[in-house]
């Protein structure tokens, strides 16, 4: 068993209270602006010096128990009264050291010292119990306030609710506290309702969350943007997109400006429900209501149209992006090209591939593979070779499947067989299907590039002679 050392606190405090100079013993300065540079003199009858010095000594201790012993020793001295900050510092130290049984003793001393109990000390209590992940202790702090004849403030209620709903199994206790808080003189505010609505939505209890929203209005608690956003997300999560749209209309009619996340949630839900007309109308409506669509909103709409084989409508969305000053990214182009290929519009897809590369984006190998496969299926060898050449010139990756389609088109039978064997070895060596030819064989990339150019030249000459 390890024994704690016995400290000579009298010696410690004699050192602590040694004169700073022959003429400035116990001299400190207040920090308030109206008393700037006005000296504060500790009680000269106190043998251990000023409360400020004791506070600093307590704060400097890494051992919470030693800090508590210093606190207790100072408390026993005649004519000494701890500062309020000393109590707060000690509560934090004891809480973080998990000496929770000693905290009540500090509270009792704080009360007996004549200090009025303020919300700050209970805020500290909630903080230490929350950090220790002790929801029961957090909940008990509410009743501890009442025990000390202190009426909790809405911020205390909200912090307690926030902690409780973040722990599995404590939602019902949070709800009971919420319902009883009015009986104790604590009026829940918008934040209180939002915390519980969010928790019930995540717990798949949308009906309770919506009832809470109704109670807000009955009790003249004004909802905010977050209140609507929470419910919109809850309705969309349950697939009730029409209910979510009604909330949006109510929100707009009351003068609220929905945030971007609310619009993103609605657009996603409308697209998944294949209500593309409504989704596009919402996209156009955003700008009129003070929220310019961003990249996420446009990409959501492009994906929605492409999923329903409406690539030309998706192309219109891309054009809208540009006209509204929002630049497409690689996801925008990749989604659109994929949608065009799915509908057999390979020439259109090739144009957007070239535009994509010209803007500095690197096409995923699936994009070039989709285009090459499509052109080859229609016997458009030159167009397929064009795609390969454009991608290679940009130093991008081609999938091995793409090469297997292209090589027979540009090489004779003997060359094709040799290159095919080489590719098989290369893919085995690299253990990947997207290996670049230029990385696995000296000169092979240049060789195939020259073959592509020759193939295209021959195709042009044949067309000229027809």
Curated annotation (Swiss-Prot):
A single BP term in Gene Ontology: mitochondrial respiratory chain complex I assembly
Repeat region (PPR), residues: 118-152, 153-188, 189-223, 224-258, 259-293, 294-328, 329-363, 364-398
PROSITE patterns: PPR (PS51375)
Source organism, top-level taxon: Eukaryota
Subcellular location: Mitochondrion
Cellular component annotations (GO), alphabetically ordered: cytosol; mitochondrion
InterPro entries from the UniProt entry: Pentatricopeptide_rpt, TPR-like_helical_dom_sf
Main location: mitochondrion
Assigned protein family: Belongs to the PPR family. P subfamily.
Protein name in the entry: Pentatricopeptide repeat-containing protein At4g01400, mitochondrial
């Amino acid at each position: 068993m390890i024994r704690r050392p016995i400290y000579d606190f009298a010696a410690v405090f004699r050192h602590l209270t040694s004169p700073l100079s022959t003429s400035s013993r116990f001299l400190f300065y207040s920090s308030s602006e109206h008393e700037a540079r006005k000296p504060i003199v500790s009680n000269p009858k106190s043998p251990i010096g000023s409360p400020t010095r004791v506070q600093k000594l307590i704060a400097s201790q890494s051992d919470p128990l030693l800090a508590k012993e210093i606190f207790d020793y100072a408390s026993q001295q005649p004519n000494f009264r701890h500062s309020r900050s000393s109590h707060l510092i000690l509560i934090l130290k004891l809480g973080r050291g998990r000496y929770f049984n000693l905290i009540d003793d500090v509270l009792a001393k704080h009360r007996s010292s004549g200090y009025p109990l303020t919300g700050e000390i209970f805020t500290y209590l909630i903080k230490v119990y929350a950090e220790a992940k002790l929801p029961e202790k957090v909940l008990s702090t509410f009743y501890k306030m009442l025990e000390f004849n202190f009426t909790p403030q809405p911020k205390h209620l909200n912090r307690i609710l926030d902690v409780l709903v973040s722990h599995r199994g404590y939602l019902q206790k949070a709800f009971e506290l919420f319902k009883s808080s009015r009986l104790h003189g604590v009026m829940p505010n918008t934040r209180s309702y939002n915390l519980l609505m969010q928790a019930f939505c995540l717990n798949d209890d949308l009906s309770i969350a919506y009832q809470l929203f109704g109670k807000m209005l009955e009790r003249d608690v004004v909802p905010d943007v977050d209140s609507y956003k929470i419910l919109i997300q809850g309705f969309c999560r349950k697939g009730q997109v029409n209910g979510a749209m009604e909330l949006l209309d109510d929100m707009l009619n009351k003068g609220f400006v929905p945030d971007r996340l609310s619009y993103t949630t609605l657009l996603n839900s409308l697209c998944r429900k294949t209500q593309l007309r409504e989704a596009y109308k919402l996209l156009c409506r955003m700008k009129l209501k003070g929220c310019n669509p961003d990249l996420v909103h446009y990409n959501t709409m492009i994906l929605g149209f492409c999923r329903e084989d409406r690539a030309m409508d998706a192309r219109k969305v891309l054009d809208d992006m540009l006209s509204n000053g929002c630049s497409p990214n690689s996801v925008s182009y990749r989604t659109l090209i994929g949608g065009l290929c799915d509908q057999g519009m390979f020439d259109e897809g090739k144009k957007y591939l070239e535009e994509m590369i010209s803007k500095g984006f690197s096409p995923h190998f699936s994009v070039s593979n989709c285009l090459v496969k499509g052109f080859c299926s229609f016997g458009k060898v030159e167009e397929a070779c064009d795609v390969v050449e454009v991608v290679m010139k940009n130093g991008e990756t081609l999938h091995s499947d793409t090469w297997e389609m292209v090589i027979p088109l540009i090489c004779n039978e003997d060359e094709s067989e040799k290159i095919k064997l080489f590719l098989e070895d290369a893919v085995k060596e690299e253990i990947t299907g997207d290996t670049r030819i230029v990385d696995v064989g000296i000169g092979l990339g240049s060789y195939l590039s020259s073959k592509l150019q020759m193939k295209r030249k021959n195709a042009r000459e044949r067309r000229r002679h027809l």
